[in-house]
Amino acid sequence: MPQLDTSTWFINIVSMILTLFIVFQLKISKHSYPTHPEVKTTKMTKHSAPWESKWTKIYSPLSLPQQ
């Protein structure tokens, strides 16, 4: 059974990492970021659910009989 030739693995891995780095740098450099980011205020709207206006009884668990 022949041995696996690993002599070219190093250059392949290094070139792949370098290519990925360059591609990601090019993708990131095309993004335009705002120079002065501002906080966007959002209004909280209250959604009323039908069960909020009704009184509901909360049942406590059954207690053990007194001994």
Swiss-Prot record:
Positions carrying N6-succinyllysine: K54
UniProt lineage: Eukaryota, Metazoa, Chordata, Craniata, Vertebrata
Membrane-crossing residue ranges in chain numbering: 8-24
Mode of membrane association: Single-pass membrane protein
Location relative to the cell: Mitochondrion membrane
GO biological process, one term: proton motive force-driven ATP synthesis
Molecular functions per Gene Ontology: proton transmembrane transporter activity
Family matches, as PANTHER family: ATP SYNTHASE PROTEIN 8 (PTHR13722:SF0)
Disulfide topology: none
Physiological role: Subunit 8, of the mitochondrial membrane ATP synthase complex (F(1)F(0) ATP synthase or Complex V) that produces ATP from ADP in the presence of a proton gradient across the membrane which is generated by electron transport complexes of the respiratory chain. ATP synthase complex consist of a soluble F(1) head domain - the catalytic core - and a membrane F(1) domain - the membrane proton channel. These two domains are linked by a central stalk rotating inside the F(1) region and a stationary peripheral stalk.
Family, as annotated: Belongs to the ATPase protein 8 family.
Residues modified as N6-acetyllysine: K54, K57
Main location class: mitochondrion
InterPro entries reported in the protein's UniProt record: ATP8_mammal, ATP8_metazoa
Protein's UniProt name: ATP synthase F(0) complex subunit 8
Keywords carried by this UniProt record: Acetylation, ATP synthesis, CF(0), Hydrogen ion transport, Ion transport, Membrane, Mitochondrion, Transmembrane, Transmembrane helix, Transport
Coiled-coil segments: none
Subunit structure: Component of the ATP synthase complex composed at least of ATP5F1A/subunit alpha, ATP5F1B/subunit beta, ATP5MC1/subunit c (homooctomer), MT-ATP6/subunit a, MT-ATP8/subunit 8, ATP5ME/subunit e, ATP5MF/subunit f, ATP5MG/subunit g, ATP5MK/subunit k, ATP5MJ/subunit j, ATP5F1C/subunit gamma, ATP5F1D/subunit delta, ATP5F1E/subunit epsilon, ATP5PF/subunit F6, ATP5PB/subunit b, ATP5PD/subunit d, ATP5PO/subunit OSCP.
Protein's UniProt keywords contain Transport: yes
